[in-house]
Amino acid sequence: KFSIAKNHLIPATLGEHGLDADSLVIDDDALRAVIDRYTREAGVRWLKKQLARIARYASEKIVSGTAARPYVVTAEMLDPILGREVVRQETARNVAVPGVVTGLAWTPVGGEILFIEGTSMPGKGNLTLTGQLGDVMKESATISMSLARSRLAYKANGFDFIASDVHIHVPSGATPKDGPSAGIALFAALASLITGITVDPKTAMTGEITLSGTVLPVGGIREKVLAAHRAGIRTVILPSENRRDLEDIPDEVRYEIHFIFVDTIDQVLFEALGVDLHETRAPIPVRNRVIPVENI
């Protein structure tokens, strides 16, 4: 969109409003801000309308003599010209909280980060899911819970699966969400909640999981990584089979993010939480009794 606007839309808009490059200059940061904060579409129709609003505003200033030529538009000037931003950009959080993980999603208008939040309470082992999740995403959460119960019993830090209910919420509840690509993020959120170990809020992840613990490739990697970069994410965990998709990501973005590739949820646990499932197992506390692993 940036290239299309720079090379085609802006010159056309200037001509339509009787302006030229010596009359109006929209700097690169302002153009990126218009794209990110004032448009949300797969095409460029709304972007063209916003550029036209800027051109009309500049024309009025120049004709009235209240602005010199060229009239330079910066990102800081967009609020009085276009009003409040219409797209709220999520940014990486600064505080790590057990049970909270950053995922990556693809939408028809580009990628975005999403937060997966988990909490627990006394109960009977039930799993509650909220945030307008579709059937496929609910299945991913169920798989994640089964994997957590089967893999993390001896790492549970006193967590009682039988006597606890777990609630997973994905904010922006008014927006429907679906698809399998949040699998590893859902699992990591549950693992963080159960172990009490936090995940770096500057780390984001995407990938489908199976009941055997395999991590499968997902789509929309370019859009997801670009969204992560915009949000201030420093590390992205991806399925190994998506490694080739990095070729589609601009160099300036690819070199500023640390990529980690995984094949299994065991690797996700190690990379995201520092939990090694292959180390020597300690006895498992089960309801007030300590039972050696080999006797379970």
Residue ranges and their predicted role:
Residues 5-6, 10, 31, 55, ...:
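Alpha-helical structural signal
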Residues 2-52, 57-71, 151-163, 196-202, ...:
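Conserved C-terminal "switch" segment of AAA+ ATPases
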Residues 30-120, 124-133:
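Conserved catalytic-core segments of large NTP-driven translation/proteostasis enzymes
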Residues 27, 74, 250:
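Residue-level signal for threonine
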